[in-house]
Structure formats: structure tokens, C-alpha cells
């Protein structure tokens, strides 16, 4: 009694579902390419978590304005090769981003035997097996310029100490994280799609429904994360991981709910009536769950000053909105158009044949006739 009839909405879905499905097919490839574009800038570390609208972000911006960007790297090389260490230090100093170097050959002298150096000084730059070069660089903690600088330093160190030099530092860690993620991201995405397909295959007992659902679900995710390419937004990779997982799970639930209800209704109804009945029955549960998530996401975005949380809220709100539109409008279009294929590729579907009478319609007509007779 508290829920308005959804017959009008169901009829609206029936009118627009096929064009909506065509739109999904039209944007699936561009959305996939855009969401995985190398032109999207990801933040992997913590240096951009607090923006200029926070006190901490303003203080950090002021420090950078006065002193510039600064980071510290450490190069570890095998101990005892003083001449090679000197050559390495000289070549690193030639890099414009390297502000200073602290090492044995720089603090003391390559001509002074280590046995004659002061122990306190020696302990700062020499270990039992390795010598340490501490580099102060004028580079941010992460970003394209940092990634290029780390690559240059690694190439120089490997030239002097092939396979033996080691490099550490915040910018180095961020670069390693970026390189690892870049290689693994495609594999992880593929595994996620295969896993979702397998779950849907077991849940629907159909060969065609999992393909349809994965297409609609993944396209909605790709559309969500294609936006930064066109808006220039820098994307926190952690936000991408969290929101894409949530959006995937949410859309799978909605898709299974609608697909299963449609299959049940098709046993006793023709596809038009079954689709109308499905949308009347499933719209409220889907909208209730989805609206809670999208409102929560936008509230987190509006309230939080933490960069990652703020972006998680934004992508969650937008992503759930896209998933709702895709599941409520495009998915019914695929179910309607591919009804015959679904019936043939689904285990024990028992869809009502085209030439069969609709039991629901017959019952309604019989009731109306009885009422008239009385």
C-alpha cells in the first residue's frame, strides 16, 4: 500500500530497453579502451591524499612553494670498489634532478683508505658488505617525472654494477608499485571477468545469460572509469580497486535478480508480459539497494577531506547510478531481443511457446467473463 504501482515505469522500460541495449553495444569498446588508457594518471602513493582544500594540503603546498620538491633515494652497491663507486657518484651528480650525494667517496675521499676514516663517519655510508650512496633529488614522490628519474638512476647503477646495485626510497617504491600494477592489472581484470562468468554460469544454468550479464555489468564499470580520461581527473588506484569491486558485486546481484525473475515469468507468460511483470516486481528492490549505495557514496564525497575516501565516494555514487541505468533499462532490452536464444541455451528453461495461450491472460479473461455473467 505504500509503494506506487510500477506499471507505467515497466511500460516505459519496454519502450526504451532496445535503444538502451543498442547504446551499451555502441559504447562497450570505446569505454573499455578509455578506462584502460595509459593517458589516465594514477596516484599509487600517499603524497596526494590531502588536497589544497585541507590544512595539511595547504601546508604541504607552501613547503613545496618555498623549498621545491624533495625526496631521498638510497643506492646500495657492493663494498670495496672505490673507483667504480666514484664513477657512479660522478655520473649521478650529472643528473639535473640530483641535488646532492652522500657517500664514502663524497664525504671522505676515494684516496683515503677506509681503515683510516673515522668510524662514526664510516658507519653512515659503509656496511659489512655494501656501500651506501644517499641521493637528495628535486623530484615529487610520484608522477611521470619521478618514474623517469628512477629509471635513469637504475640504468646508471646497473651500468656500473650489473645486477648488483639496489635502489630504495619513497619515489622508488611508488615506481615499483606502478610497474607491478601496470603488468598485473590486465591479468587481474581478466581473472575477475572469468570468475564472474563462472559464478553466473552456475547461478543461471545458462550459456547465454552470463554473457549478457557480464557485457552489461562490465560496460557500466568501464564507463565509470573512462571519465577521468576526458575530465583530466587524477585517479587513486586504491579507489579504482575498491569501487570496481563493489560496483561489480552490486551489478551482479541486480542482474541475477532480474534475469532469474524473467526466466520464471517466461514459463507462464509471453516475453512482453514477462518483461513487464519482471520490471514491476524487481524495480523497487533494485532501486532501494542502489539508492542507499549511491547516496552514501555522494555523501562520503561531500563530507570527507581524505583524498582517497573522497574519490571512492564519487566513483561509488556515479558507478552505482550507471549500473542502475544499465540493469534497469539495457538489460531488459537484451532479455527481450535474445529471448529465443536464452530459451534454447538455458537448462530446463521451459519458456512458453509463441503459439501457446498465456495462462495469466486466460485467467484474467475468464474472471472478467464471470463477472459480466453475474
Language-model regions: role of each:
Residues 1-41, 158-374:
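Membrane-embedded transmembrane helical bundles of large multi-pass transporters/channels
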Amino acid at each position: 500500500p505504500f509503494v506506487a504501482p510500477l506499471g507505467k515505469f515497466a511500460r516505459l522500460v519496454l519502450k526504451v530497453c532496445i535503444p538502451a541495449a543498442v547504446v551499451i553495444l555502441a559504447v562497450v569498446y570505446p569505454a573499455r579502451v578509455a578506462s584502460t588508457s595509459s593517458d589516465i594518471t594514477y596516484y599509487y602513493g600517499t603524497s596526494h591524499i590531502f588536497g589544497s582544500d585541507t590544512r595539511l594540503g595547504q601546508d604541504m603546498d607552501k613547503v613545496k612553494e618555498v623549498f621545491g620538491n624533495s625526496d631521498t633515494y638510497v643506492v646500495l652497491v657492493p663494498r670495496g670498489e672505490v673507483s667504480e663507486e666514484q664513477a657512479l657518484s660522478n655520473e649521478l651528480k650529472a643528473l639535473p634532478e640530483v641535488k646532492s650525494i652522500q657517500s664514502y667517496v663524497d664525504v671522505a675521499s676515494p684516496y683515503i683508505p677506509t681503515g683510516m676514516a673515522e668510524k662514526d663517519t664510516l658507519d653512515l655510508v659503509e656496511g659489512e658488505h655494501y656501500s651506501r650512496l644517499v641521493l637528495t633529488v628535486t623530484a615529487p614522490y610520484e608522477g611521470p617525472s619521478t618514474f623517469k628519474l628512477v629509471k635513469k638512476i637504475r640504468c646508471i647503477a646497473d651500468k656500473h654494477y650489473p645486477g648488483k646495485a639496489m635502489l630504495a626510497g619513497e619515489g622508488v617504491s611508488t615506481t615499483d608499485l606502478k610497474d607491478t600494477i601496470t603488468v598485473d592489472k590486465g591479468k587481474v581484470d581478466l581473472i575477475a571477468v572469468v570468475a564472474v562468468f563462472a559464478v553466473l554460469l552456475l547461478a543461471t544454468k545458462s550459456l547465454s545469460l552470463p554473457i549478457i550479464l557480464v557485457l552489461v555489468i562490465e560496460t557500466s564499470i568501464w564507463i565509470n572509469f573512462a571519465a577521468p580520461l576526458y575530465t583530466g581527473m587524477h585517479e587513486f588506484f586504491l579507489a579504482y580497486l575498491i569501487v570496481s569491486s563493489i560496483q561489480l558485486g552490486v551489478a551482479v546481484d541486480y542482474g541475477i535478480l532480474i534475469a532469474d525473475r524473467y526466466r520464471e515469468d517466461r514459463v507462464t507468460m509471453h516475453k512482453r508480459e514477462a518483461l513487464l511483470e519482471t520490471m514491476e516486481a524487481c524495480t523497487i528492490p533494485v532501486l532501494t539497494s542502489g539508492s542507499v549505495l549511491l547516496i552514501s557514496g555522494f555523501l562520503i564525497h561531500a563530507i570527507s577531506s581524505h583524498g582517497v575516501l573522497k574519490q571512492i565516494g564519487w566513483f561509488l555514487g556515479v558507478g552505482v547510478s550507471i549500473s542502475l541505468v544499465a540493469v534497469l533499462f539495457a538489460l531488459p532490452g537484451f532479455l527481450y531481443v535474445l529471448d529465443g536464444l536464452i530459451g534454447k541455451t538455458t537448462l530446463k528453461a521451459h519458456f512458453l511457446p509463441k503459439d501457446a495461450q498465456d495462462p495469466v491472460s486466460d485467467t484474467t479473461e475468464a474472471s472478467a467473463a464471470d463477472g459480466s455473467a453475474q
